[in-house]
Amino acid sequence: MLRIMVVSGLLLAVVMGLAAQPAFAETPDEVLASFKKEAAGTPGFQGFSATRGENFYKTRHGSDWSCSSCHTDNPAAQGKHAKSDKVIKPLAPSANSERFTDIKKVEKWFKRNCNDVLDRVCTVQEKGDFLTYVLTIKK
């Protein structure tokens, strides 16, 4: 009986430990790899560029905003929303380890922010270039 209780207790501890972990935690490199896989089917795709990503990040697009309007010129710095003044944690994974670790959140924020900045969704090329750039930023 004691043996059953010990085994049951250990099993419960393992299950609870697994439940506490994020279900699909990715690394930023894995998110980038998923963009690359998606982009591979695009005619003319030749890879992502940190230079294009930096230009995309800092350029004002269709509206008066750029990514840096809220996230600052330094993605490793804390930002502030241009309209609401809400504080935004650093964008660069080197300064904020939670960034780009959940593909669903990544896609949600790209959808929202691209619509705000570009008045359209971002292409996979733009997302890949952007992430390639942000991954070059050191704290």
Outline where the language-model segments fall.
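TPR/TPR-like alpha-solenoid helical repeat scaffolds
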Residues: 86-92
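Short cysteine/histidine-rich zinc-coordinating motifs and their immediately flanking basic loops
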Residues: 79-86
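Local sequence-structure signature of Cys/Sec-based thiol-disulfide redox active-site neighborhoods
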Residues: 54-65
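The canonical Cys-X-X-Cys-His
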Residues: 63-75, 130
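Post-cleavage N-terminal segment of exported redox proteins
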Residues: 2-50, 94-139
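Short acidic alpha-helical/loop segments enriched in Asp/Glu that coordinate divalent cations
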Residues: 27, 68, 82
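Short alpha-helix boundary/capping elements
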Residues: 61, 75, 135-139
